Regions:
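Short, charged, surface-exposed secondary-structure boundary motifs
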Residues: 51-56, 146, 205-206, 224-227
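Short, electropositive alpha-helical surface patch
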Residues: 30-43, 187-197, 252
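Flavin-dependent oxidoreductase catalytic cores
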Residues: 1-114, 118-134, 142, 203
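Rossmann-like dinucleotide/flavin-binding elements
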Residues: 109-139, 178-186, 190, 197-207, ...
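A short helix-to-beta-strand connector/capping loop
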Residues: 38, 170-177, 211-215
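Short, contiguous acidic/charged loop-to-helix segments that flank catalytic cores in large enzymes
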Residues: 101-103, 108, 149-161, 218-224, ...
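N-terminal Rossmann-like dinucleotide/flavin-binding domain of flavoprotein oxidoreductases
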Residues: 145-191
Length: 263
């Protein structure tokens, strides 16, 4: 609710209903804004792409079941601006509901999913919801994959919400989760289907000195909190490179006052 304060000021100056919008992505926040009198109505757009059942789940008293919008804009706004079909990074069924129909499986199978990043979590929970017996293997001690790294970048803290949501879905759908277990061929014997969802690894360029102790990958920086010096060179200006710069330059818990001053 980044513009809540502005909405409240407008409401105090007008005698007509005022609608609050922008980053109101949970029912609790929406209720708080309405109860405080800062707005008469609340507008939600992206949160309903992330979970079209948001209102129904809130009304049923199950906010933990909501797939929360993380404001990534990677399939909604950017697609809209590019004249493409809008969808959602955390809900790929958005605007594809008639094409991606998760019908009950005609035959129950034993399915192994290797890797508990976002792709593996989505695959495992959908397969289980369709009636399959699913086991999910993850080599590390927690689920989330690359989203765990993204969540430490200032401004991307809400990526943790997607990890939380899939934790709920794993339990709801009955997926058997094997943490700290790197799946071997022996582990996968007896399954009818095996899905490999082990994700990506950083691409290390062949540059003289790349093996120097001061050279880090983004995973070592964000995931292991490796220390860096005062002057840092970042190789790669894609999304991850920008995130690394944001991580190095900004405090993770910026105040609303400082945020407003910056923007």
């Amino acid at each position: 609710a980044a513009f809540r304060e502005v909405t409240a000021r407008i409401k105090r100056a007008l005698k007509i209903p005022v609608v609050a919008s922008n980053r109101i992505n949970t029912p609790e926040l929406a209720e708080e804004i309405l109860a405080s009198g800062d707005a008469d109505l609340v507008s939600m757009a992206r949160p309903l792409l992330a979970d079209p059942e948001l209102v129904n789940k809130a009304a049923a008293g199950k906010p933990e079941a909501i797939n929360t919008c993380i404001a990534c804009n990677q399939a909604c706004l950017d697609h809209a601006f590019g004249m493409k079909r809008v969808s959602c990074l955390v809900n790929p069924r958005a605007c594809h509901e008639t094409e991606l129909e998760y019908a009950r499986a005609a035959q129950k199978k034993r399915v192994a999913v290797v890797g508990a990043g976002m792709a593996g979590l989505a695959c495992a929970t959908v397969a289980a919801a369709r009636g399959h017996d699913v086991t999910l293997f993850e080599a590390s001690d927690s689920v989330g994959g690359q989203f765990r790294l993204a969540a430490v970048v200032p401004g991307k803290e809400e990526f943790r919400e997607t990890i939380r949501y899939f934790g709920y879905e794993l339990e709801r759908t009955g997926v058997k989760l094997k943490l700290g277990q790197r799946a071997s061929a022996a582990d996968l014997v007896g399954f009818d289907e095996v899905v490999i969802a082990t994700g990506v690894v950083p691409r290390v360029p062949r540059i003289p000195g790349i093996d120097h102790p001061k050279v880090l990958t983004y995973a070592q920086l964000l995931g292991e909190k490796r220390p860096v010096g005062e002057r840092v060179a970042v190789i790669g200006a894609g999304g991850i490179g920008i995130d690394v710069c944001e991580y190095l330059l900004h405090e993770p818990n910026i105040s609303l006052k400082d945020w407003c001053a910056e923007w």
